[in-house]
Amino acid sequence: MNIRPDQNRLVFSADTLKIDEAAEADRIVAGLRAQLRSLRKRGLVLGLSGGIDSSVSVALAVRAVGAKNVFCLFMPENDSDPESLRLGRLVAETFGVEAVVEDIGPTLDAMGCYQRRDAFIRELVPDYGPGWASKIVIANALEGDGYNISSLVVQDPEGKQTKLRMPPSVYLGIVAATNMKQRTRKQIEYYHADRLNFAVLGTPNRLEYDQGFFVKNGDGAADVKPIAHLYKSQVYALAGHLGIPEEIRRRPPTTDTYSLEQTQEEFYFSLPYDRMDLCLFGLNNGLSADEVGRAANLGVAQVKRVWADIAAKRKATRYLHLGPQLVQPVEEIE
């Protein structure tokens, strides 16, 4: 890291977020072992998506408890990208863990997940049906002040895409139906955790955890979350140290939730993860917008817009981090 001689402080850059990967891996492994002892659990269960976060989490879990005590699940559904299953299997083979496929498509169909979602979409696009695809996108936070308004993108069977503004009722309805996917996956994870006497491992990184990029009682539910303190760029650095296949390390982060291909950037975050990390770190550590802007290649006004978006998401998603609220504390179990 570079030091400013005149101010005796660090020059902020991407290097500021660098970690000692070996030491950090050892620290997380020790933490996982201690948490499992406290929970009185024998091993770890997690969903394996083929993304960087779950892949790194598998590698850390194997180091902590051994491959025979790690149980992984592939849980595709009707809208899943087949690449996710292929890459997930690659990770499972790389680290020698037991992994099974639990196709949740029929369960979601039986619960009306897809039908409920499509009914809300048809309020805007009456012809929406078989052969169509869709996703939700947000406006670019760098291009204006205020909230990031979500839009619906639909693609007809001929491949023509149309972008539409959604009234709140349609947005909430689509999201509510889609959240069934994450909650169904978590039910299956806990089924296997219960039968094995294992703990469920959650895989959010710091950016996702801070910004509420998870579903309450869905992918947000877990017994341990070993990488929630790491910025996304730090997770990628750890992936290299842990031997995550290069193909996965090169893959852009995706949601793999909607039927149209969708990046995390267009769905939720204002910027690519590496620049979001710099903005979040700068905000968390009291750096100036000018310092962050030079590191992230953004203007001061743009940094301030990103910070406003971070603050808005923290406020809007605070309830996701809360447990059930009691009228009066039950002191004996506090």
From Swiss-Prot:
Deamido-NAD(+) binds at R183, K216, D223. GO terms for molecular function: ATP binding; glutaminase activity; metal ion binding; NAD+ synthase (glutamine-hydrolyzing) activity; NAD+ synthase activity. GO terms for cellular component: cytoplasm. Mg(2+) binds at D53, E208. Transmembrane segments: none annotated. It comes from the Bacteria. Pathway: Cofactor biosynthesis; NAD(+) biosynthesis; NAD(+) from deamido-NAD(+) (ammonia route): step 1/1. Keywords: ATP-binding, Ligase, Magnesium, Metal-binding, NAD, Nucleotide-binding, Plasmid. Catalyzes the ATP-dependent amidation of deamido-NAD to form NAD. Uses ammonia as a nitrogen source. PANTHER family: GLUTAMINE-DEPENDENT NAD(+) SYNTHETASE, NH 3 /GLUTAMINE-DEPENDENT NAD + SYNTHETASE. Homodimer. This is NH(3)-dependent NAD(+) synthetase. It comes from Rhizobium meliloti (strain 1021) (Ensifer meliloti). The gene is nadE.
